[in-house]
Amino acid sequence: MSRVKGGVRTRARHKKILKLAKGYFGAKSKNFRIANQAVMKSLVYAYRDRRARKRDFRKLWITRINAAARMNGLSYSKFMNGLKKSGIALNRKMLAEMAVNDAEAFAQLVEKVKAVI
């Protein structure tokens, strides 16, 4: 029986990696070995940053809420504690959106929280 070297499968694998590396600079988009390393590293970065994105947005929301709350005379922690005590269930994403795009409504929310504290 003759030996099969697997050229078809190898060609397909190389094409798949080079397709993923399309747009990379220099040898990273032309040379399979270098492109393979670049693609593997980019997938590691993508995996890591999908998780980091969640942390980054939470930090951004907290910063925005804190800034808006301080403009209305409360710290972030007192504001969040007052929200919890008053039974207002708004998540940080919605609060940050309100703080940026609807400052009047956010100010009314702060007044409700001040009444509870």
Curated annotation (Swiss-Prot):
Record's keyword annotation contains Magnesium: no
PROSITE patterns per the UniProt record, alphabetical: RIBOSOMAL_L20 (PS00937)
GO cellular component: ribonucleoprotein complex; ribosome
InterPro entries assigned to the protein according to its UniProt record, in alphabetical order: Ribosomal_bL20 (IPR005813), RIBOSOMAL_L20_CS (IPR049946), Ribosomal_protein_bL20_C (IPR035566)
Keywords in alphabetical order: Ribonucleoprotein, Ribosomal protein, RNA-binding, rRNA-binding
Keyword GTP-binding: no
Superkingdom, taxonomy of origin: Bacteria
One GO BP: ribosomal large subunit assembly
GO MF annotation terms: rRNA binding; structural constituent of ribosome
SUPFAM superfamilies: Ribosomal protein L20
CDD domains (UniProt xref): Ribosomal_L20 (cd07026)
HAMAP family the UniProt entry points to: Ribosomal_bL20 (MF_00382)
Task performed by this protein: Binds directly to 23S ribosomal RNA and is necessary for the in vitro assembly process of the 50S ribosomal subunit. It is not involved in the protein synthesizing functions of that subunit.
Family affiliation: Belongs to the bacterial ribosomal protein bL20 family.
Protein name: Large ribosomal subunit protein bL20
Organism: Acetivibrio thermocellus (strain ATCC 27405 / DSM 1237 / JCM 9322 / NBRC 103400 / NCIMB 10682 / NRRL B-4536 / VPI 7372) (Clostridium thermocellum)
